[in-house]
Swiss-Prot record:
Protein name in UniProt: Phospho-N-acetylmuramoyl-pentapeptide-transferase
UniProt organism field: Acidothermus cellulolyticus (strain ATCC 43068 / DSM 8971 / 11B)
Function: Catalyzes the initial step of the lipid cycle reactions in the biosynthesis of the cell wall peptidoglycan: transfers peptidoglycan precursor phospho-MurNAc-pentapeptide from UDP-MurNAc-pentapeptide onto the lipid carrier undecaprenyl phosphate, yielding undecaprenyl-pyrophosphoryl-MurNAc-pentapeptide, known as lipid I.
Metabolic or biological pathway, per its Swiss-Prot or TrEMBL entry: Cell wall biogenesis; peptidoglycan biosynthesis
TM ranges: 3-23, 51-71, 80-100, 116-136, 152-172, 186-206, 227-247, 251-271, 276-296, 330-350
InterPro entries: Glycosyl_transferase_4, PNAcMuramoyl-5peptid_Trfase, PNAcMuramoyl-5peptid_Trfase_CS
Cellular compartments annotated: Cell membrane
Enzyme class (EC, first level): transferase
Length: 354
């Protein structure tokens, strides 16, 4: 528990006090957000707000994780390092995208194919490494079985199938967080909630690990406590950043942050063997992503749009909802999804105790 508290506290403090330094740094260099002309007119006042704040989130989380491991007996593990590596790799892809937008003074950063290629490369490397490094009990950081709240033994993907599955999960989650990052504080707050859920899940898995004591309902998860430290570090980093990212935002996370956070969430789900459960925990991201998919499909098939604008949060903006109202209501949805996911996770464990 000490490591979890240290990770969250260090990441929170670094993010809270480091973000205003980043705001001044980016503002002095003109690293401001470009606003689409075809978006909601209320967003035009945000033009020039410093972006690439995701660098602070990522750095804070990594430092929080590193400092916490100075006080743990085992030190960093393969599972924790792989999740951090995945977040860092995707953060670099997002950083390039943000930097090109700023340098070229345009809304388009990396071309779609180039950006996708970067995500694919990072995700594939992660997927390949995740099924390496067996520990003394033969457990690897990830499993080649599909998992909900634990592995389904009958749903075996094999190594190649797992890498493809990991690629799909990483791509879907990182892009889902990216689509959600359209209003001040929305993606940051929702991400903090899901990371908080993963702290609880992985801590529970550590308390009920089959490696510690074989008992009904125990979890065959490698390094669950270190994963809890990672999740706590990212939750703390998001909370500290949210202080400055809440409306009216003084800085945006940019693709640097959204891709990194999405990657970390996907990595946590894969390593904790809660892959399908992530769709419940991150229900807000799923709803927002589906709104964009439905909008595109509807327009291509019928030449009609279902929503005034996609993703969904912009639909409500154009209906006249205040930005803060949308964010708070969407946070409520995110919180309910997290509560439901935790309930499902705990309920499944209870069934083993009867």
């Amino acid at each position: 528990m000490k490591g979890i508290l240290i990770a969250a506290s260090v990441a929170l403090l670094i993010s809270l006090f480091g973000t205003p330094i980043a705001i001044r740094f980016f503002r002095e260099r003109g690293y401001g957000q470009l606003i689409r002309d075809d978006g909601p007119t209320t967003h035009h006042t945000k033009r020039g707000t410093p972006t690439m704040g995701g660098t602070v989130i990522l750095a804070s989380a990594l430092l929080g994780y590193a400092v916490a491991n100075l006080f743990t007996a085992s030190g960093p593990t393969a599972s924790g390092l792989l999740v951090c590596g995945l977040a860092t790799g995707l953060g670099l892809v997002g950083f390039l995208d943000d930097f090109i937008k700023i340098r070229m003074q345009r809304n388009l950063g990396l071309r779609a194919r180039t950006k996708l290629a970067g995500q694919v490369i990072v995700a594939v490397i992660f997927g390949v490494l995740a099924v390496q490094f067996p520990n003394h009990a033969g457990l690897r950081p990830a499993s080649t079985h599909v998992s909900f709240v634990r592995d389904y033994p009958s749903l075996t993907l094999g190594t190649i199938g797992f890498v493809i599955w990991a690629l799909l999960m990483v791509s879907a989650t990182s892009n889902g967080v990216n689509l959600t990052d359209g209003l001040d504080g929305l993606a940051t707050g929702a991400s903090a909630m899901v990371f908080g859920a993963f702290v609880i899940i992985t801590f529970w898995e550590a308390r009920n690990s089959c490696l510690a004591k074989a008992a009904p309902g125990c979890y065959h998860v490698r390094d669950p406590f270190d994963l809890a430290i990672v999740a706590a570090a990212f939750a703390g980093a998001c909370a500290g950043f949210l202080w400055w990212n809440a409306a009216p935002a003084r800085i945006f996370m940019g693709d640097t942050g959204s891709l990194a956070l999405g990657g970390a969430l996907a990595g946590m789900a894969i390593m904790s063997h809660t892959e399908v459960l992530l769709a419940i925990l991150g229900g807000l991201f799923v709803v927002i992503t589906m709104s964009s998919i439905i909008q595109i499909a509807s327009f291509k098939l019928t030449r009609r749009r279902i929503f005034k604008m996609a993703p969904l949060q912009h639909h409500f903006e154009l209906k006249g909802w205040a930005e803060v109202t949308i964010v708070i209501r969407f946070w409520i949805i995110a919180g309910l999804a997290v509560a439901l996911g935790l309930g499902v996770f705990y309920g499944e464990w209870i069934t083993w105790q009867g």
